[in-house]
């Protein structure tokens, strides 16, 4: 598999340090608020990576942490009249609920920062002993950035350029404006722990270094997160870990792109902040997961409700094809009509292309393109009145079951019973569009009556009236059926 390594800025062949085993760490949430769709993207991207690596036979140990002590958590605790621990527990619970709905697998190891205070203190002590960090009279501990010559190697930033714009805030006791906090002296009303420098709490960056070192052998095979974490968080992780341990921290760095809303970066200040729960009020969870896979993970993805509608339509087409394929397979008699020679070859090619897309830096967008290619091929067979009855078509439909199982295993979508998904989707669209089903049923009943009376002008007028309500009517041998446009 080729992976784009943010450290080398190029694609590299992925080879685990220990053949057959992968140690992977992804930065998790700071538990102070509901998860937004940026969190959803990171979670889904690395969930697919874990799924795919396991699909290829690798033994993956996956860790994702929780930051449960932080300035934002303390601020939220004061706002809500809760303790920091209560706030963190509340939003860790909502994180799990959201991830379960998005079919994101639980990590094997889910460490919390507050459970690793001793490890963080020990790492600080090691850095101080090496002259890479220093304690201030007030009890803060800072990392000496200039003591690590390779600082900036991940983000590509020049240390002198950073220095020119850096300032020491009033009250700080930094030796250099670039230095960052490893340990923060306690403030009144904040959670704190006893340390060699007095009461205090860890800085954000030291947390992931201490937790990953405790739970996994270093260097990690893969460390992931959003592109916003490259600097300063991941840059600082590298500096403090490698300075303390004198060995590489991570072999492959992977970063997913931003989620934009209407072509602007999502932020609370712009008023375009979308939580997962906001979106799932109007769309099925599988639609959101599918949408997040429609772009390459390193590219930005633009969230709009139009793009969600398009993702919903695409997913609906796939499930409709799977439903039709299942219906056709129930046929009792099959003909000996041969399929064109290239059909089976095309089926095989699309299957291989799906895997090749994921081998190429986890290109889920291309992989989904090959899923659609497979569905188009199946639809082409089922639309041909002769080929749909062929025993060779039956053999391909039976193989389709295996492909769908693989798609589900790797991408985490297409795994529901088609009829159940389509029924839930219809109900979801009815709610989202505020459709009055009582009125729809009454119009359909009237249309049935006027058609029986051969008043086709009125029947067509009712069809148009239903279309204006967002309803599509199809006449079948067993009667009219309707769906939401």
UniProtKB/Swiss-Prot annotation:
Positions occupied by motif 'HIGH' region: 29-39
Signal peptide limits: none
Location within or outside the cell: Cytoplasm
One annotated GO biological process: cysteinyl-tRNA aminoacylation
Recorded superkingdom: Bacteria
Cofactor(s) this protein cannot do without: Zn(2+)
Bound cofactor: record note: Binds 1 zinc ion per subunit.
One annotated Gene Ontology cellular component of this protein: cytosol
Pfam families: CysS_C (PF23493), DALR_2 (PF09190), tRNA-synt_1e (PF01406)
Catalytic activity as recorded in UniProt: tRNA(Cys) + L-cysteine + ATP = L-cysteinyl-tRNA(Cys) + AMP + diphosphate
An MF annotation (GO) of this entry: zinc ion binding
Keyword Cytoplasm applies: yes
Alphabetic keyword roster: Aminoacyl-tRNA synthetase, ATP-binding, Cytoplasm, Ligase, Metal-binding, Nucleotide-binding, Protein biosynthesis, Zinc
Transmembrane segments: none
EC number: 6.1.1.16
Residue sites binding Zn(2+) per the record: 27, 208, 233, 237
HAMAP family: Cys_tRNA_synth (MF_00041)
NCBIfam families assigned: cysS (TIGR00435)
Family listed: Belongs to the class-I aminoacyl-tRNA synthetase family.
Oligomer status and interactors: Monomer.
Record protein name field: Cysteine--tRNA ligase
Gene source species: Nitratidesulfovibrio vulgaris (strain ATCC 29579 / DSM 644 / CCUG 34227 / NCIMB 8303 / VKM B-1760 / Hildenborough)
Organism lineage string: Bacteria, Pseudomonadati, Thermodesulfobacteriota, Desulfovibrionia, Desulfovibrionales
Gene giving rise to this polypeptide: cysS
